[in-house]
Amino acid sequence: MAARKETGNTAPIAETAVKQVQIDGLVVLKIIKHYQEEGHGSEVVQGVLLGLVVDDRLEITNCFPFPQHTEDDVDFDEVQYQMEMMRSLRHVNIDHLHVGWYQSTFYGTFVSRALLDSQFSYQHAIEESVVLIYDPIKTSQGSLSLKAYRLTPKLMEICKEKDFSAEGLKKANVAYEDMFEEVPIVIKNSHLINVLVWELDKKAPVTEKHELLNLSSSNHLEKSLQLLMDRVDEMSQDIVKYNTYQRNVGKQQQQKHQYTQRKQQENLQRLSRGETPLPEEDVNKMFKPPVTPSRMDPLLIAGQINTYIQHIKGFTSQNLGKLFMAEALQDQTN
């Protein structure tokens, strides 16, 4: 997973550090090319975003990929690789300010603990950092899917304190809707590129417009539903584990209470016989409390479930619209 070397000087968290992300068209093409060359199936590709901050707008002007490597490549130093790349870009007078990272996704699967830790590391070091999520499957169906996300101030505070217990999340009032905030994206090209795109569009052959009504998302919908069911199963298992923890805590509290009562009765009997009462013992040392499970993983699972649901809603609404348009065209031909 992408990592960012933290620095000692970090600015305080602002409510709206970045209100808009402006991306050069070249960066978008580099991200797409990176996945086409190295991404296969569910394999994730990642890279570094470079640019600068202008007021409340983050301008991403360049990027470079992380090379594919395995855990066995002990000689590969990711931080050293980033520093060498940034020094090389500085020598050729290219923007080299580290402003975030990008990652591809497989059927919208990106809400994970690894992404949370990486984005926290970036955002803690550089306040304006964002993560770009590129969906190649949705893009292959005709619409570019590229979104920018940041961790919310609430989640940043929780990650700093590292209190992922149920009480800590409840105290911070953090739900799955409060984990990530989406930042609007604007893709910018130079005037020469815009003219070239206009000329290419004029020269492009006219395709059959009825192809737009093709319901080609059945496989995508089936896979999204399968992934959704898997996450729901994970959530169900986690609920069972947490309920077991709560029962164990209740049993232990009852055992502590029974032990304390027995100890008091025994001391009263010893005093009535004129004997010295037994010394007091630390009950908490005698009864080791159960390990409190982290509630961050269920929160992330809930966020991923919500992402799948939004994707499914988008595809089903598109298909319903296509069905209505196809019906209208059929009525006209008849």
From Swiss-Prot:
Coiled coil: none annotated. GO terms for biological process: formation of cytoplasmic translation initiation complex; translational initiation. GO terms for cellular component: eukaryotic 43S preinitiation complex; eukaryotic 48S preinitiation complex; eukaryotic translation initiation factor 3 complex. Gene3D superfamilies: Cytidine Deaminase, domain 2 (3.40.140.10). Its main location: cytoplasm. It holds the Pfam family JAB. Keywords: Cytoplasm, Initiation factor, Protein biosynthesis. Residues 247-284 are annotated as: Disordered. Residues 251-262 have a biased composition (Low complexity). InterPro entries: eIF3h, eIF3h_C, JAMM/MPN+_dom, JAMM_MPN+_peptidase_M67A, MPN. One of its GO terms (molecular function) is metallopeptidase activity. Residues 21-155 form the MPN domain. It is found in: Cytoplasm. SMART domains: JAB_MPN. The keyword Cytoplasm applies. PANTHER family: EUKARYOTIC TRANSLATION INITIATION FACTOR 3 -RELATED. HAMAP family: eIF3h. Belongs to the eIF-3 subunit H family. Component of the eukaryotic translation initiation factor 3 (eIF-3) complex, which is involved in protein synthesis of a specialized repertoire of mRNAs and, together with other initiation factors, stimulates binding of mRNA and methionyl-tRNAi to the 40S ribosome. The eIF-3 complex specifically targets and initiates translation of a subset of mRNAs involved in cell proliferation. Component of the eukaryotic translation initiation factor 3 (eIF-3) complex, which is composed of 13 subunits: eif3a, eif3b, eif3c, eif3d, eif3e, eif3f, eif3g, eif3h, eif3i, eif3j, eif3k, eif3l and eif3m. This is Eukaryotic translation initiation factor 3 subunit H.
